[in-house]
Each structure stands twice: as structure tokens, then as C-alpha cells.
């Protein structure tokens, strides 16, 4: 069975490391790499710096051989799981911020879900 690796894209400064790790996994398993961005209603409120970082992360994913996909929805974890299920993804690579989240983003982290 071919390994199908899914890496989740974000504007996080650490996302580049996650993308490189996923690309190495895809190469090691002789599999395919897909990079997924979940666009939420809050994506339009992203600051200029975050927008530029996201563009850079998308570019890195493309350079790493990933097929770039975008889905839309409010529930990021649901969108990732549903995309993975429908696409036959065998492994999901996501990062987790070490920083405490406040305000709108408080609560259970994506990794914990």
C-alpha cells in the first residue's frame, strides 16, 4: 500500500520544519505528499506578516513536491479528518504551538482533538 502523507499548512514560524519533516517521511516511505490549508472565516483577518509566512510555507511545500489543497470550514480538525478520509491519507503531520493560546483560539488544541 502506498503511503499518502498529509501535512497541514499554517502561518506558524515552525510550519517550515513540519513541512520538511513530512517531505522526508514521504521520501522515506516512497509515498506522496499533500499539503492542506484549512481556510476559516478568520483567515481573512490574518496580519500581513502571517500572510507572507503562509505564502512562504506554501512555496516550501510546493518545492518539497507536495500537491497543495485548500478546504473551507469553521472546524479545522473536522476538515482535516474529512479530507484525509476522502483522499485515502495514511499519515497526517501537524505541528503544535508551544505558546499558550488566548481569546478566540483558546481551548483544546488541534493536536489534542
Residue ranges and their predicted role:
Residues 96-113:
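Glycine-rich, Arg-bearing micro-motifs that act as flexible, cationic patches
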Residues 43-45, 78, 101:
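Generic structural signal for helix capping and beta-alpha/helix-loop junctions
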Residues 2-49, 55-63, 69:
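Small/aliphatic-rich secondary-structure junction motif
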Residues 50-54, 86-88, 110-111:
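Short, hinge-like loop/turn segments at secondary-structure boundaries
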Residues 15-16, 77-78, 111:
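Short, well-ordered alpha-helical microsegments
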Residues 64-91:
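Structural beta-alpha unit
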Residues 37-41, 73-74, 97-98:
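Short, ordered loop/turn segments at secondary-structure junctions
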Residues 15, 50, 73-74, 107:
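A conditional alpha-helix N-cap/helix-loop micro-motif detector
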